[in-house]
Amino acid sequence: MLDAPSAPAAGLQIETGSPVIRLTRLRLLDGAPMLAEEIWLPYDRFAPLATLELDAFGDLLYPLYESHCGQIIASAEETLTAEAVNATYARLLRIQPGDPVMVIERVARGYDRVPLEWRRSRGAAAHFRYHVDIR
């Protein structure tokens, strides 16, 4: 359990300093890092995850949220931006500090529209592809 920094708190619509759970993941494709993720969850809704063994976490988190915490993600909104990567994320993504990365910020909500998850994912811009189907 951590105190929520300002950006995750704003995304989750909770007070800065409120108790949260922070998950970090490195998403791989054929052994190469594609995305470095930080995921923030309000502690009061996701407390069972704080004591869960690491091997219980799979690739898909939303089914885990439902089965262990009773929280169902109904929708999500994403914002894409670009930035120069810092040394920490450069090391994780195996790129050089200052290289461009795409940043995806996601707010996932329950059926009641209350934010349940705030996520920030970073991936090397060289590997990034965006596709949208507009009808």
Question: What does each of the following model-derived ranges do?
Answer:
Residues 1-135:
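All-alpha effector-binding/dimerization core of bacterial HTH-type transcriptional repressors
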